[in-house]
């Protein structure tokens, strides 16, 4: 242990400590219904359109993480984070193509309440006083929730509708899981050298992302 008294298993410890909330975020009834083959397709279309808006906002967030990374003495994380930036253009194109397939008019979509709340949270990371450790923790948590959620939809025994397998494989793939693990390693390393107040702020960000993800899934299932 060093820095804020944190060892290299900090993220794993958080996932255990906040297990109930983590499972609510990654085994939400919405994504479980995809795996079970019982998903309401109108809910899926709502998720598709709202997540498209989220991803557009996510671009600025990743840029803020990258900027904080560049200011670190050791900027070796940059290549991994740049991988996230590079994938965004493809992701936006994917959403547009899927919207066409599903007959969703993205131009007419407005962000719902839970989405706007998430947007406000992401925008707060442009503030210079928010540390790189907190920012990269947030980035890792967002990506990991999606990987775990959609990865579950393609595990053995799934009844995921064939037309949704591409969506689930996009975030549930082994390649994306490896990317999330790379981010997790960065987070653990940063936290091992961070002061106690930064570690606490990072844990609070971890929990906040879980809350926002649950709200986003809830929004997809309803119209709130």
Swiss-Prot record:
Sorted UniProt keywords: Disulfide bond, Hydrolase, Thiamine biosynthesis
Pathway field: Cofactor biosynthesis; thiamine diphosphate biosynthesis
Annotated gene: TENA2
Biological process (GO), any one: thiamine diphosphate biosynthetic process
This protein's name: Bifunctional TENA2 protein
Binding site for substrate: 51, 91, 143
Tissue expression: Expressed in roots and shoots.
Leader sequence residues: none
GO molecular function: thiaminase activity
GO cellular component, one term: cytosol
């Amino acid at each position: 242990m060093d820095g804020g008294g944190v060892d290299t298993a900090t993220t794993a410890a958080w996932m255990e400590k906040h297990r109930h909330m983590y499972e609510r975020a990654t085994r939400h009834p919405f994504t479980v219904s995809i795996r079970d083959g019982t998903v309401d397709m109108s809910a899926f279309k709502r998720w598709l359109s709202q997540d498209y808006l989220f991803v557009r906002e996510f671009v600025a967030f990743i840029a803020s993480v990258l900027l904080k990374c560049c200011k670190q003495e050791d900027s070796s994380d940059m290549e991994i984070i740049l991988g996230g930036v590079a994938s965004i253009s493809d992701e936006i194109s994917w959403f547009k193509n899927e919207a066409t397939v599903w007959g969703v008019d993205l131009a007419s979509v407005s962000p719902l309440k839970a989405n706007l709340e998430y947007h406000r949270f992401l925008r707060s990371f442009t503030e210079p006083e928010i540390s790189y450790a907190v920012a990269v923790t947030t980035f890792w948590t967002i990506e990991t929730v999606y990987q775990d959620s959609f990865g579950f939809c393609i595990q053995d025994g799934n009844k995921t509708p064939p037309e949704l397998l591409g969506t689930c494989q996009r975030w549930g793939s082994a390649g994306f899981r490896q990317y999330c693990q790379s981010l997790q390693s960065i987070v653990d390393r940063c936290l091992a050298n961070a002061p106690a107040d930064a570690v606490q702020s990072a844990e609070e960000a971890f929990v906040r992302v879980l809350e926002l993800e649950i709200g986003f899934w809830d929004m997809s299932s309803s119209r709130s």
